[in-house]
């Protein structure tokens, strides 16, 4: 059978017999495979230690933890390229995360021109094994029978362990596979009782207390937001000024709407980023994307739900659809995993980061590398360098044309002006695109078309400035007011000169609204020369 083309549907059967349909017909980056890069030998052979890699366009999300959460280390992370601070609520309490936020605020006082967004990552409907006798790991061998009970108070041993998911016996059936401890242990279901599941161990493994469990191909009957998550969002996320909620294990658009209802009026401006990490999330991706403000590709758990050789297809499909929708996408998990212990990444890891950039991701994320690793600052530095290099070999005109082709028409006035701004900037070889934006939409629409020029977004809203930290190619500048547009633009150009984004005599393209008092409707495009 011939290999499928990029315009065909790539399908893989999951454990339920359904087809996991990964449609790549709308792909922007995949359509340009082999055409969107312009690589010269000099780029490969030249190496400049003093090059400013902080100009990378792809944003970097750093997970907080003991290795990086003191003030001095945060300052170093900001200098190395951190744009978003991720608070992982699978670990730690409100007091600990509150100290992180306070330390970040102190660090930013030392870097007054920088902005770092806050992302609250929920624990979500996680399933875990229970405690073990004597807190000692158990050793299992292939062929062993292992009983899993739903009484979570049960203290386990090598023949029986507890599980936190009460509906496990009714959710799985004989023949299903259960993955434990990040997949290091696979067991096959052989019998389902009222309050237990009997399984057969498929491979030798040693597991400890409270390890995570995955049920590939099984729809887990747990709320996307539990009581702990509600408490974290309402009593920490909103009052502490978090800009994003990364919601774990989202399976449908209804899940996103439910989270929005929890946020209510007090949290109405917080952006929701569903994490796609199971088959249901993939199958319902289009409806989730339509309802969401962005997407996180959580490759760790996703790689347990679908075959590992399919993860890259899912990644490319999701990034492509986010690009066409003009919504930010974060690529996450094990990007520089070896740097938790080593000062240099594996070559495969560096290539993984670069390929995510070439795919079109807005952000790349570090997890244990910064939270618990021995080289957190080096990890961010490496990521900045790789992003910078990958961005330098993209054919932005090809990407622009493909994005225009993939975007359904008609488009609204604001997007038409944004698209025209990018095309004009290309035509006149402008050095910068300037966007005056109250809500951030103008800057997001310009960034959707991936101009080769940097985008400088001016906003009077600190909240908007923070939320633009996940948008690829956007640099932000806080202004006191939008009254007096011409003076604002002059001030912005002076700031751009200080940031070395433009020089005297350069052409720039500016986008803003005719009516200064009306937010969310930019309909004016100007071409200016820097004086």
Swiss-Prot record:
Group of enzyme by EC: transferase
Positions annotated to bind K(+): 88, 90, 121-122
Keyword Kinase: yes
SUPFAM superfamilies: Phosphoenolpyruvate/pyruvate domain, PK beta-barrel domain-like, PK C-terminal domain-like
Residues engaged in binding Mg(2+): 277, 301
Reactions catalysed, as given in the entry: pyruvate + ATP = phosphoenolpyruvate + ADP + H(+)
Quaternary structure annotation from Swiss-Prot or TrEMBL: Homotetramer.
Family designation: Belongs to the pyruvate kinase family.
Stated name of the protein: Pyruvate kinase
